[in-house]
Every structure is written in structure tokens, then in C-alpha cells.
């Protein structure tokens, strides 16, 4: 079988490459061309290419999107939430001090966030490190409350799974722009714990704000209890 002419032109070069702030693809002529970006569309990868984050640690980073808007990106395994992520959530709650006017929480990964790192929580529980667990929960609650009442707009842009703590991050945002393929829910009961970053009260608030809810408090709250107790995701 003869080798196609295109592959002869390619040789040992990659079909795609990145240089500086641009991404390139190889044309049928064997030359590189800049990957076009549709007007009004962007990916975080385009912002990150050739730039340095405003703030960063092992779990998350804050990027400058331009026009006074920052983006918080979680980049742990499966975008799970650990102490590094919580620390960067706290940092994101004061980005106005660095001149930013708005915050977007999102990433280019398949999943927004699968929630807390259960493995770390299990390790701490088995070691009876109760003060550590209590402090972790408190810091997570405080971080999300700062975002909820931030003096600037906070937009969550979930795609894929936003479960447990990931869902609670979305619930803390002032606005949500969700991908069509998004799956959200407070699923902590599935592993034997209850939502700890404020998601329970956020669901209650939304249930009570629903003008079409049944009369009285309990009928509306029963739906919230059912959703949490059955680890429902939608």
C-alpha cells in the first residue's frame, strides 16, 4: 500500500501545534495555518496560551479574560474540590481588589466539578482528624458565602457534571450559563455524608422563592429533602 501524499508531506511533524498565543493545524498542502476562532466565541485554552495566571496553586487558577473579567479554573483530577481549590475560591472572592469587575467560574474540561475529594475526607475521618474536617467545611462555607455576596457579578458556567460541592459552587453564583449537557445535584448522601458547603439552604431558598410552590412551608421543603436524601441529579 502506497503512503498517501499528505503523510509524505507531514513527515514526522505534528498535525497540530501551539506557538505563542496561537494554535495551528496542518493543511492538505503540508503547511501550518492558524486555527480560526469564531467571532464572539472563545475557549479558556485560548486565554491561557502565552499568558500567566493572576493567581494559581495546584488545585485552581485565576485568569484574566480581559474587559475587567476574571475566570476561576479548577484543574484537579476530575476537578474535585480540595483545600487548594477552596483557597483559590477565597482568593476569587476578592478579585475586585485587583481591579476586576466580574468573575466567571468555569473550565474547558469534560466536567465542571465532581465535588469534594472524598478520599481526603475519608482519610481524615479514619484518622479522627475532626478539627481538620470542621475547619475544611467552615472554610468552604465562608468561601462560597463571599462569592454569593461579592460586590461584583459572579457567573458560573457548568458543563458536564457539577455534583456535590461543584453544584454548591454553581448555587452560590449570581447567574448561571449552563451547557446543554450539564448534570447537577447534591449527591453527597450517596457516599454517606450531607452537603456541607451551603447547598442545602440554597435549595431551600430557591424552593421558597418559587411563586408556584404549594401553600405552606413543608410541601415546598419536602421536595428539597427528597432531592437531597435521594442524591438526585438532573
Tell where the protein language model's regions lie, with residue ranges.
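N-terminal glycine-rich phosphate-binding loop for ADP-containing cofactors
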Residues: 1-110, 119-139, 145-152, 162, ...
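Gly/Ser-rich catalytic serine loop of serine hydrolases
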Residues: 156, 160-166
